[in-house]
Amino acid sequence: MTKPHIVIIGTGGTIVSSGTSGAQMTGYSIQGLDVRSIISAVPALAEIANIDALPLLNIGSSNIKLSDWLKLTCTINKLAEDPNIHGFVITHGTDTMEETAFFLNLTLKTEKPVVLTGSMRPATAISADGPLNLLNAVRLASSKQARGKGVLVSLNGQIHGARDVSKTNTVSVETFCSPSSGPLGYIIG
């Protein structure tokens, strides 16, 4: 069976950040790594899909601007024209992930899965959540069931729709919820 082709687009955020020690959970450097670093830290990705990395931005999500959203939209819309690409994962900071997801949900012109993911702990933390979140996001973007569902947010094993998701906690790995509807699903595996 042919593996799906997934493009992982890096925009920065905690998922590619680094601290000075494994115990540092705050005050870390956002400029530490890029999306290729986190991909290489998760070799199981190659078992699920053929991966292309696209480091598009490297910013803290609190600094994202309309021009960045437009760049992301144009990039995905252009890449989505390629029939060999099955879906997209966007690594993103959690501060504005829900806003980016909502904007993309309104502006993208593709039925292909688009999944935003990130982390609450830097890549260098003892129990970094980014690698598993990335793995689960690729699993979701590779799923035929995710096609046509709009932009999705996946962290901590949960799947949320862009229209309903909210960040409700600034320190816990269980940071996102969909208060009015609940999660669309869970990733188990």
Residue ranges and their predicted role:
Residues M1-G189:
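Active-site histidine-anchored catalytic micro-motif
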